[in-house]
From Swiss-Prot:
Catalytic activity: NADPH + 2 O2 = 2 superoxide + NADP(+) + H(+)
Gene that encodes it: CYBB
This protein's record includes keyword Heme: yes
Primary role: Catalytic subunit of the phagocyte NADPH oxidase complex that mediates the transfer of electrons from cytosolic NADPH to O2 to produce the superoxide anion (O2(-)). In the activated complex, electrons are first transferred from NADPH to flavin adenine dinucleotide (FAD) and subsequently transferred via two heme molecules to molecular oxygen, producing superoxide through an outer-sphere reaction.
List of glycosylated residues: N132, N149, N240
Segments on the Cytoplasmic face: 2-9, 73-95, 195-203, 286-570
PTM statement from Swiss-Prot or TrEMBL: Glycosylated. Phosphorylated on Ser and Thr residues by PKC during neutrophils activation. Phosphorylation enhances the NADPH oxidase activity and stimulates its interaction with RAC2, NCF2/p67-phox, and NCF1/p47-phox.
Name of the protein: NADPH oxidase 2
Provenance organism: Homo sapiens
Amino acid sequence: MGNWAVNEGLSIFVILVWLGLNVFLFVWYYRVYDIPPKFFYTRKLLGSALALARAPAACLNFNCMLILLPVCRNLLSFLRGSSACCSTRVRRQLDRNLTFHKMVAWMIALHSAIHTIAHLFNVEWCVNARVNNSDPYSVALSELGDRQNESYLNFARKRIKNPEGGLYLAVTLLAGITGVVITLCLILIITSSTKTIRRSYFEVFWYTHHLFVIFFIGLAIHGAERIVRGQTAESLAVHNITVCEQKISEWGKIKECPIPQFAGNPPMTWKWIVGPMFLYLCERLVRFWRSQQKVVITKVVTHPFKTIELQMKKKGFKMEVGQYIFVKCPKVSKLEWHPFTLTSAPEEDFFSIHIRIVGDWTEGLFNACGCDKQEFQDAWKLPKIAVDGPFGTASEDVFSYEVVMLVGAGIGVTPFASILKSVWYKYCNNATNLKLKKIYFYWLCRDTHAFEWFADLLQLLESQMQERNNAGFLSYNIYLTGWDESQANHFAVHHDEEKDVITGLKQKTLYGRPNWDNEFKTIASQHPNTRIGVFLCGPEALAETLSKQSISNSESGPRGVHFIFNKENF
C-alpha cells in the first residue's frame, strides 16, 4: 500500500475529491427539487424527471467550470515554475492535466445524457398535459397562465400533440434550441477526440474542438427563459399546499386557496463558467501575442527515416530541459498549432525540434522547408513560423533526482535529447552543483534508421564521460524491436567488432524488448534508500507497464528505494 501511495496517492486523492463533489452536488440538488414545497406542483406535473434533470445540471455547471482549466497551458506553466506554489508532487499532478481534462469531459457527457433524457420525459408530459392527454390534475395545472393575473407552470403554451408538440418546443424555446446545439457540439467534440482521429486526422480533431466556443455560449444562455418554474415565496405564504392541493377546482374562489403564482430561478450557469472563461480568454490573448513575435529558422536538417530538424531563434526565448512548444506554419495552415518537444539544450543559442513526417501538416511543412528538393534552400525562402511556449512537462524535474531512468520509444526519445545535451554542456562547464549522479537511458525503436540522428549525441556523451573518468554516469541500452532474418545475420557477423554496427557506439544494440522486472530490480539493488525518477515518453501500454513496475519495486515506508513514475503528456 505504501508503494502505491508514493506514486499514485495524491492523484487518487484528487480524483476522489472530484468524484465526491460530483456526488454531493447531484444528491444536494436532487433533494432541492424533490423535497421542498416550492416545487410541489412542479413535481405533480413532471414527476421524478424534474429532480433527475436538475441534479445533473448542477454537476454540468461544476464540470464545465473545470474543463477549461487543464488546457490553460500558460497558467499551468506558471504554476509549474513557481517553487513557492508547487512541490514536486503537485507538479506531477499538473503534468496529468490532459488526463484530468478527458475525465471531466466524460463526466460532462454522462450528465448531459441524464439531463437530456430527463428533459425529454418532461417535454412529453408537458405537451400531453396541455392537450388533455394526461391526468386531470396535470391538465388543471397546465391551464394556469391562460387567464389574466396568472403565471404559468407548464412551459408548453401551445396545444400541439406529440411528436409535433415536442419538436415545436425544441425549435421555439431558447432552452430547446440551445440544448440541441450544445448537445450536437458535445457529440462532435467527443467523437473527433478518439485516438484514431487525433493521430490520422488531426485537422478534424483541431477544428471540431473549437466548437467549444459555441458550446459555452449556448450553455451560458441555456436557462435564460427560466422555463423550469417553482412556486414563489409570496405565493407559498398565502397558498398552503397542505390545505389546497386537493381543492384545485376551488383555487381563486376561497380565501385560503388563492391561485398559486410561479416563477423560474435566475440563470446560474454563467456564474460557474465566467471565471474559467476569462482565464481562458487571457490564455488565448497570450498565445496570440506570442504568435506575433518573430521567429527565424536558422537551419533545417534532414535526418533519415523522414525526420527533419528545425533550428530556430526568437528574441527573449528561454527554455528548460524537456519542455515543448506549439508550432504554426501559416503557409501550411493559418489556424493549426501542433506540439513538439524541444530537442535543444538551454545552454545552446538556438532552440530546435525534430519532426517526423507522418501526416498532411508535417508533409506540408516538409515541402515548405524545401526538404523535398535536392538543392540547397536559401534562408529567405524558408516559411514563416509562429511559436507558442515553451511549456513545462514532467521531464523538467529530471535534475531533482540523483538517479533517473529515461525511457523513450521511437520518436519519443526527443525530450531526452534535450536532457542529455544539457548534461553534456554541464560537464563541459565543470558543473559542481549537479544533483544528478546517474542516468539509465533506454531507447526502444522498430527501425535501424531511426537511430542515426540520435547516435552523434550519444557518441559525444560517451567520449565526454570517458575523458572525465566518469564513464559510469550514463548507462544506456538501445533496443531494436523489429528486424528481419538478413539483418540478424548481418548483426551476428559484426558482433565482435569494437563498435556497434548500427549506432557506432561502444555499447552494443540489444534485440527485442527489455525485461523490465529485471531492470528495476537491478537498479533498486544498486541504489538503496534512493528516490529514483522514472521518465517515459512513449505509448500507453508501456506507460502502464512502467507504472506497475515503479509501484511493485518501491519499498514501503519513508526510507528505502522509491521509483517515481512520470509520463510526458501533450
